[in-house]
Amino acid sequence: MSAEIKGSTQVKAGLAQMLKGGVIMDVVNAEQARIAEAAGACAVMALERVPADIRAQGGVARMSDPSMIKEIQAAVSIPVMAKVRIGHFVEAQILESIGVDYIDESEVLTPADDINHIEKSKFTVPFVCGSRNLGEALRRISEGAAMIRTKGEAGTGDVVEAVRHTRQMQGELRRVKSMSPDELYTYAKEIAAPIDLVKECAQLGRLPVVNFAAGGVATPADAALMMQLGCDGVFVGSGIFLSGDPAKRARAIVRAVTHYNDPKILAEVSENLGAAMVGRSVSSLEEKEKLATRGW
């Protein structure tokens, strides 16, 4: 790896580190973006439909209109992220050209390539990608991802899959930390991950990039749960702006992530939030409805 590429990778991972301990909120217009910023969000994710609406409306979900993203960029001073379809490197080129701060190669959108993910190391802008386990996370990092998030099951309001993916990841990290050098080679082959990244995880006891929770986080308690399980921050999608009082819920989730180990504050911020999003239990989804299975 050349020094130039390595430096770029380090810079991008460093930019993602700056979001650690924060909440990233899905927004569909400038007004929502301003609400998110006022509530204390560390970044916003600009998209035309939140995941719950993508589920309900069906059809092909694509990159958002660049003009909408530009309106959100103009409305706030915090970083603006946007989603592209898995494998759609031209959508990524477009988003980079308009100056988005991070790109999410997202399973929430309809995949453009069912075999290949984007070669993210070619881009200057940092990428975030979803994963269900250590193998998926390290494959995305090897492609150039600067940030990982759980896939969870977006648009459901059910946190169970995000919990499952986080516990899976933490368990695998504990396992590699206890392995001998020769066992690491075998395990790297088993999970189809580069050995240098597996070794780095063994040394660090964690991923070499930040790892956020995403998919089904709908309440302050959900957010605090994911932080206590070891996540570095939280993405909240449909759970805020499909709830009864979005501004209050947004503030509450930000405080919950900051004070995730303080039950008294968590109780305080959980009071009188209005109705949570109705949601849908993951157990009621048919296999074809599950978004987390997209990608490899």
Swiss-Prot record:
GO terms for molecular function: amine-lyase activity; pyridoxal 5'-phosphate synthase (glutamine hydrolysing) activity. The keyword Transmembrane helix does not apply. It catalyses: aldehydo-D-ribose 5-phosphate + D-glyceraldehyde 3-phosphate + L-glutamine = pyridoxal 5'-phosphate + L-glutamate + phosphate + 3 H2O + H(+). Its EC number is 4.3.3.6. Pathway: Cofactor biosynthesis; pyridoxal 5'-phosphate biosynthesis. The modification Phosphoserine is found at S178, S180, S283. The active site is at K83 (schiff-base intermediate with d-ribose 5-phosphate). Transmembrane segments: none annotated. GO terms for cellular component: cytosol; glutaminase complex. One of its GO terms (biological process) is pyridoxine biosynthetic process. It is an enzyme of class 4 (lyase). InterPro entries: Aldolase_TIM, PdxS/SNZ, PdxS/SNZ_N, RibuloseP-bd_barrel. Pfam families: SOR_SNZ. The keyword Lyase applies. Keywords: Lyase, Phosphoprotein, Pyridoxal phosphate, Schiff base. D-ribose 5-phosphate binds at D26, G155, G216, G237, S238. Catalyzes the formation of pyridoxal 5'-phosphate from ribose 5-phosphate (RBP), glyceraldehyde 3-phosphate (G3P) and ammonia. The ammonia is provided by PDX2. Can also use ribulose 5-phosphate and dihydroxyacetone phosphate as substrates, resulting from enzyme-catalyzed isomerization of RBP and G3P, respectively. Also plays an indirect role in resistance to singlet oxygen-generating photosensitizers. Belongs to the PdxS/SNZ family. This is Probable pyridoxal 5'-phosphate synthase subunit PDX1. The gene is snz1.
